[in-house]
Amino acid sequence: MNTGLEISILHNLEMSKLLDTINSPSDLKKLSLDELRELAVQIREELVNRVTLNGGHLASSLGVVELTIALHRVFESPKDKIIWDVGHQSYAHKLLTGRREQFATLRQHGGLSGFTCRDESPHDPFGAGHASTSISAGLGMAVARDLAKEDYSVISVIGDGAISGGMSFEAINNAGHLHTKFIVILNDNGMAISPSTGALSKFLNNVRFDPRFEFAKRNAKQTITNMPFGKAVWAFTKSIKRKFEKSMLPGSLWEELGFIYLGPVDGHNIRELEAALKRAKDFESKPVLIHMITKKGKGYDDAEADAVKYHGISPKSGGLKSSHGLSYSQVFGQTLHKIMSQNPQVVAITAAMTDGCGLGEIAAAFPDRVFDVGICEQHAVTFAAGMATQGYIPVVVIYSTFLQRGFDQIIHDVCLQKLPVVFAIDRGGIVGDDGKTHQGIFDLSFMSLIPDMVVSAPSDENDLQHLIYTAVNSGKPFALRYPRGFGEGAEIESSLHNIPIGQNEILVNGSDVAILATGKSVAFAKDALEILTESGIKPTLVNNRYISPLDSELVLKIAQSHKYLVTVEENVISGGLGSRINTLLAEAGLVNKIKIANIGIPDKFVEHGNQSLLRAKYGLDGKGIAQRVLSLVGNPNEMKHPQIICP
């Protein structure tokens, strides 16, 4: 017979294996409430351990553990479609949908994505990485289901930050109009929307959440409308109810938009969550919004105390390190701070990336001149355009991948009107572990095709500060694109000066071979020069800081005095620096007089992996550039340096 202590030990051993027993969502349905609570603890431990090793989005995933468990107990994934907005809070979802054994590879090259990915699992019905897409995608799936006369649930999970994006409201408006059966879960972690408070509010919402209330409401309507003048009485009663709700209830906005509102629900109470999800599942004729209150970073004290800091973290090992001290974002922030101190007409605008873009100290110093508009990139661009019409010089500070969302506004609202808006494009080029949705490899192409847009990419920190100064004083639409990570250790001059627009510079004079590199690629081209010099090749190296307008005079001069021309860029080749130079040489009739090679990203989406690995894979590091040059011109010292293998 087992003693109480032995039973306790056996119980603890069984509990310790809970996460290991979950191979699919169906396994969750066998667990008791106590076991589910223990499972939530184990999931959080796994998330903290793995994300601190691999890096990733921690606080968001910690906040939705109970929701993830409840979703997979109430619904039948992958038949039912669960869509995670942005996807960075889907780590627990990955653990519970058969990816536990692969979880150690999270955000590693060839491993699990840090976001949802259709290619990765049938439990990921929609890929993500950018915000505010889940409601549109979910509504599309729900309408497709109804057209095909199929039967499954569609659930979109969206945070209070992402729901501020304009695309979310477009989808909400459409969903209310269509009256499609569809569930939206609003994860309110207090970062953007204040939780409802007060005993009356809680009481009224509890009443409205109770199925008996819905039954009573239907019976009351039937009874009153069957009375003499009943329809008029019911209409009057309903109007009074709506006015009362509008002033007292947090759900009235959603009901006006055509949704049934349930909540607020404790997002860390599995029993409450399951009750809400089952209730929402029963509604047939309208979309339902469940308002869920959670704590971002739940279960990890450091993340709960500073959810912004722990939103995304770097790995303990293998993260970004530098002896140079300052990142490009920090140099940008310091330079803009100096400029704004001297010029009161300069303002900064960002879309929910104040700290990530280096604007934190500037916002503290100039709180009335730094505007965080939320996850609203389109609005950010046109808001900047409006300020520019009134004599201000707006600097829109934004990650490359998110700037894509404001492309029409850049053309229509800024460039067509020749407004002096500066676009400070952070995270240009290969960003690494966040993968396909976050690589900044298209900006040189889509910005360069716009008439009257100046497009530049600094070669180092010193180049960056002077280009910022040039942009602010240019009076033109001006884009400057800089990479993620630390600088090159360049000496930063104390005074700022203009760099003539369209003027590039020769860094090294050589012969026969000319390498025209832009941005971060200049540093790798310098590494390539060391290898090539050992091989008997002494190339010319150009810092091609301006992509548009091109320094046509310099390019043509080089083309006429060299046998080989190589372009290097961390951007898709199509439409980028290489394409623009190819076009220039073709128009000048020089393409048959010089051999050309374009080094850049091929026509594909770049997977996740650390920056060094990806640069090596795509031939963008020093060795890769040298190998490409050697394959173009041949190796005079091939026998002397057999370690260099040319493709």
From Swiss-Prot:
EC id: 2.2.1.7
Residue numbers binding thiamine diphosphate: H88, G129, H130, A131, G161, A162, N189, Y300, E377
A GO BP annotation: isopentenyl diphosphate biosynthetic process, methylerythritol 4-phosphate pathway
Top class in the EC scheme: transferase
A Pfam family reported for this protein in Swiss-Prot or TrEMBL: DXP_synthase_N
Cofactors: Mg(2+); thiamine diphosphate
Entry note: cofactor: Binds 1 Mg(2+) ion per subunit.
Residues binding Mg(2+), per UniProt: D160, N189
Gene3D superfamilies for the chain: 3.40.50.920, 3.40.50.970
Pathway annotation from the record: Metabolic intermediate biosynthesis; 1-deoxy-D-xylulose 5-phosphate biosynthesis; 1-deoxy-D-xylulose 5-phosphate from D-glyceraldehyde 3-phosphate and pyruvate: step 1/1
InterPro entries assigned: Dxylulose-5-P_synthase, THDP-binding, Transketo_C/PFOR_II, Transketolase-like_Pyr-bd, Transketolase_C, Transketolase_CS
SUPFAM superfamilies referenced in this protein's UniProt entry, alphabetically: Thiamin diphosphate-binding fold (THDP-binding) (SSF52518), TK C-terminal domain-like (SSF52922)
MF (Gene Ontology): 1-deoxy-D-xylulose-5-phosphate synthase activity; magnesium ion binding; thiamine pyrophosphate binding
GO cellular component: cytosol
Record field: catalytic activity: D-glyceraldehyde 3-phosphate + pyruvate + H(+) = 1-deoxy-D-xylulose 5-phosphate + CO2
Protein family membership: Belongs to the transketolase family. DXPS subfamily.
Function, in words: Catalyzes the acyloin condensation reaction between C atoms 2 and 3 of pyruvate and glyceraldehyde 3-phosphate to yield 1-deoxy-D-xylulose-5-phosphate (DXP).
Protein name stated in the entry: 1-deoxy-D-xylulose-5-phosphate synthase
Biological source species: Dehalococcoides mccartyi (strain CBDB1)
